[in-house]
């Protein structure tokens, strides 16, 4: 029998050599940028399942994070993050291109009109496998992209590393805003302001702080975030399209 005092050094060596348990990843954080408060959530499509959601099997619009989460739980999945994802009509149906699970439920809207959606150029956030992008609408149509998920909104905040020329640094409209940007074809950054900000300040956040060469405005007045890692669950107005990150329940 080996004496305990001879086993102790070996046991200690094994203990310190063992890898530490991985800390749970928190994709969301609160930040300040040029005096304004934001919450940002960053994901990688190579590892994270980013999807769009609108209605259940009965064609009833989810309308809330709670309803969506409950539906996912029934499928053995859970919601890690969610945000409103595009503008919609009085029935809470998208007013622009909407693709879910490879099925196009609404075609691209290229009409002119009033409001932020029609503040050209507008654009499309899309996900296809491990790739994602924010693409100006006309370019998206010209390239004939067929992603698994897509939502159209407007205006584009950043295009090719430049702030949308229709967004001026002299703008005075201050609102809560949320949007999405993509870099390197797979890093997806979502942001929501925690206080009213101008379009230019919001666009600058994506270009300078989040390093996204392309970014899209999702909405303003109804902006909402579900981030359980931050104990945040916004419950404001009923929503239309929702973007979420999902994982299988263990």
Predicted regions and their residues:
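Active-site-adjacent helix-turn-beta-strand microarchitecture at beta-sheet edges
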Residues: 93-167
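Short acidic-glycine loop/turn motifs at beta-strand connectors
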Residues: 44-46, 91, 126-131, 159-161, ...
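Bacterial N-terminal signal peptides
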Residues: 9-17
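Zymogen propeptides
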Residues: 21-116
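Conserved, well-ordered active-site substructure
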Residues: 95-115, 166-214, 223-250
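Short, solvent-exposed aromatic-acidic interface loops
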Residues: 57-59, 138-143, 192-196
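Bacterial N-terminal signal peptides that target proteins for export
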Residues: 1-8
């Amino acid at each position: 029998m080996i004496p305990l005092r001879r086993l102790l050094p070996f046991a200690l060596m094994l203990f310190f050599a063992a890898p530490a348990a991985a800390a749970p990843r928190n994709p969301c954080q609160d930040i300040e940028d040029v005096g304004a408060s934001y919450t940002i959530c960053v994901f990688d499509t190579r590892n994270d399942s980013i999807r769009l959601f609108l209605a259940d099997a009965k064609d009833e619009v989810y309308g809330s994070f709670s309803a969506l989460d409950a539906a996912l739980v029934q499928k053995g999945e859970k919601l890690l993050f969610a945000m409103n994802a595009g503008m919609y009509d009085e029935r809470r149906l998208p007013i622009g291109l909407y693709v879910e699970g490879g099925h196009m439920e609404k075609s691209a809207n290229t009409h002119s009109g009033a409001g932020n959606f029609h503040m050209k150029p507008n654009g499309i956030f899309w996900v296809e496998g491990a790739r994602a992008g924010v693409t100006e609408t006309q370019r998206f149509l010209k390239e004939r992209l067929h992603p698994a998920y897509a939502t159209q909104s407007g205006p584009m905040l950043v295009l090719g590393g430049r702030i949308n020329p229709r967004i001026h640094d002299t703008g005075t409209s201050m609102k809560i805003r949320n949007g999405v940007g993509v870099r390197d074809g797979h890093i997806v950054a979502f942001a929501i302001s925690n206080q009213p900000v101008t379009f230019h300040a919001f666009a600058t956040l994506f270009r300078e702080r989040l390093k996204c060469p392309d970014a899209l405005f999702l909405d303003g007045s109804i902006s909402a975030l579900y981030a359980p890692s931050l104990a945040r669950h916004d419950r404001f107005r009923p929503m239309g399209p929702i973007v979420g990150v999902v994982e299988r329940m263990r």
